[in-house]
Amino acid sequence: MHLSLLKAKIHRATVTHSELNYEGSIAIDGLLLEATGIREFEQVHIWDVTNGARFSTYAIRAEEGSGIMSLNGGAARHVQVGDLIIVAAFASMSEDEAKTFKPNLVYVNAHNAISHTNHSIPTQAA
């Protein structure tokens, strides 16, 4: 049996551009792609914290250090500049692989620069 587990996450990034007439995708600062291990053209899920929209697209590289988070094409209709989003990628793996797998979790500041990273999410308490 194979499981689908969270591979990588960019947490609470700020949308910098919304380009309806650009070829569809999300352009992500290259430093964030490197930190997460998300590959160019990999499917990603976008969860808009601001408006609740959830959709999928694919990642393309934006200039390193630019802070760009640009939703393009049809995806641009789901967000507005300034919205907070979570970008997530998943990987399929065996149960044995899943036992030791740790996701790459990247947390960013208001300018989409890396504030810190982690490989686990704290247990939620009541």
UniProtKB/Swiss-Prot annotation:
GO terms for molecular function: aspartate 1-decarboxylase activity. It is found in: Cytoplasm. Its EC number is 4.1.1.11. Binds 1 pyruvoyl group covalently per subunit. It catalyses: L-aspartate + H(+) = beta-alanine + CO2. Pathway: Cofactor biosynthesis; (R)-pantothenate biosynthesis; beta-alanine from L-aspartate: step 1/1. Its cofactor is pyruvate. Is synthesized initially as an inactive proenzyme, which is activated by self-cleavage at a specific serine bond to produce a beta-subunit with a hydroxyl group at its C-terminus and an alpha-subunit with a pyruvoyl group at its N-terminus. InterPro entries: Asp_de-COase-like_dom_sf (IPR009010), Asp_decarbox (IPR003190). Gene3D superfamilies: 2.40.40.20. It comes from the Bacteria. Substrate binds at residues 57, 73-75. SUPFAM superfamilies: ADC-like. The modification Pyruvic acid (Ser) is found at residue 25. Coiled coil: none annotated. Keywords: Autocatalytic cleavage, Cytoplasm, Decarboxylase, Lyase, Pantothenate biosynthesis, Pyruvate, Schiff base, Zymogen. GO terms for biological process: alanine biosynthetic process; pantothenate biosynthetic process. Its main location: cytoplasm. The active site is at residues 25, 58. GO terms for cellular component: cytosol. Belongs to the PanD family. Heterooctamer of four alpha and four beta subunits. PANTHER family: ASPARTATE 1-DECARBOXYLASE. HAMAP family: PanD. Catalyzes the pyruvoyl-dependent decarboxylation of aspartate to produce beta-alanine. This is Aspartate 1-decarboxylase. It comes from Xanthomonas euvesicatoria pv. vesicatoria (strain 85-10) (Xanthomonas campestris pv. vesicatoria). The lineage of its organism: Bacteria, Pseudomonadati, Pseudomonadota, Gammaproteobacteria, Lysobacterales. The gene is panD.
